[in-house]
Amino acid sequence: MAMYQNMLVVIDPNQDDQPALRRAVYLHQRIGGKIKAFLPIYDFSYEMTTLLSPDERTAMRQGVISQRTAWIHEQAKYYLNAGVPIEIKVVWHNRPFEAIIQEVISGGHDLVLKMAHQHDRLEAVIFTPTDWHLLRKCPSPVWMVKDQPWPEGGKALVAVNLASEEPYHNALNEKLVKETIELAEQVNHTEVHLVGAYPVTPINIAIELPEFDPSVYNDAIRGQHLLAMKALRQKFGINENMTHVEKGLPEEVIPDLAEHLQAGIVVLGTVGRTGISAAFLGNTAEQVIDHLRCDLLVIKPDQYQTPVELDDEEDD
């Protein structure tokens, strides 16, 4: 069965060009499925109009929602006229990330696409607070779309964790590879590469233990990672030349390799840890994301549960 058959596109309210919608249509043309163009809006000034009755406030909100709905319809007109099934939904909500995740849950959406803004000079992608909330808390995969065309022959680079002895990391590695291969086969037979980073010898160990041999330690760590990568690639029938085990910090290794390969997308897993307030993306993942210059797909483990709940009832 084809993946991503119920896509939610987060519309950027500040520009007419919508790269995330364009990417969703690109996927639709190759794998089918439905698209919902979704925009949460809020204007505090409308809440300050104490002279208005609740009915008048509701009417004002509804007027803004109608205006924005018509505006999105105009953005999507070309696709709609071409027969692409796009539903448009605008809601009034003062926390955009909550509105998006609630829509994902209530609508059963299996992929969220959102535009990632770029720093003009650095070309690096800049993530907003809403982006980070989605990457940390959205139960469905989140695809951050860079405002550039998909590179010709763009590859998919899957970042895997080869060091951990935790069983959930193995399951997540396999999920990342499996889903990326499935998607790649359906979208232009995209080439899939795997990357794992391993740490360099801590300098303080070499200083404190004179008999410690850094080269032996490095060889052992590298060997461990190579064996783990071999097992993973063999499970999915991936050629050795499509796998990369590199020495260094993940936040340097992964973006550098993505650039070297001219990757169109980096696929990354994040592990949810309940009880650790909003910090469960993990420093490593966040630093990797901060250095990327291409699209990003973030996937959670199967057992992940979002801390965001559906509202009991609509606000007045």
UniProtKB/Swiss-Prot annotation:
Keywords tagged on the record: Cytoplasm
Query: Which ranges form a coiled coil?
Result: none
Q: Identify one Gene Ontology CC term for this UniProt entry.
A: cytoplasm
* Inducing or repressing factors: During growth inhibition caused by the exhaustion of any of a variety of nutrients (carbon, nitrogen, phosphate, sulfate, required amino acid) or by the presence of a variety of toxic agents. Positively regulated by guanosine 3',5'-bisphosphate (ppGpp) and by a RecA/FtsK-dependent regulatory pathway.
Q: Which PANTHER family match?
A: UNIVERSAL STRESS PROTEIN E
Swiss-Prot/TrEMBL GO biological process terms: bacterial-type flagellum-dependent cell motility; cellular response to hydrogen peroxide; cellular response to UV; response to stress; single-species biofilm formation
Q: Care to name a GO molecular-function term for this sequence?
A: small molecule binding
| Similarity comment text for this entry | Belongs to the universal stress protein A family.
Q: Which NCBIfam families did the record assign?
A: PRK11175.1
The record's principal subcellular location, in a coarse class, is cytoplasm
| Parts of the chain that traverse the membrane | none
The record's function comment reads:
Required for resistance to DNA-damaging agents.
Can you name this protein? Universal stress protein E
Q: Which InterPro entries match?
A: UspA
One family name in Pfam for this protein: Usp
Q: Where in the cell is it found?
A: Cytoplasm
**Which CDD domains does the UniProt entry name for this protein?**
USP-E_repeat1, USP-E_repeat2
User: What SUPFAM superfamilies does the record point to?
Assistant: Adenine nucleotide alpha hydrolases-like
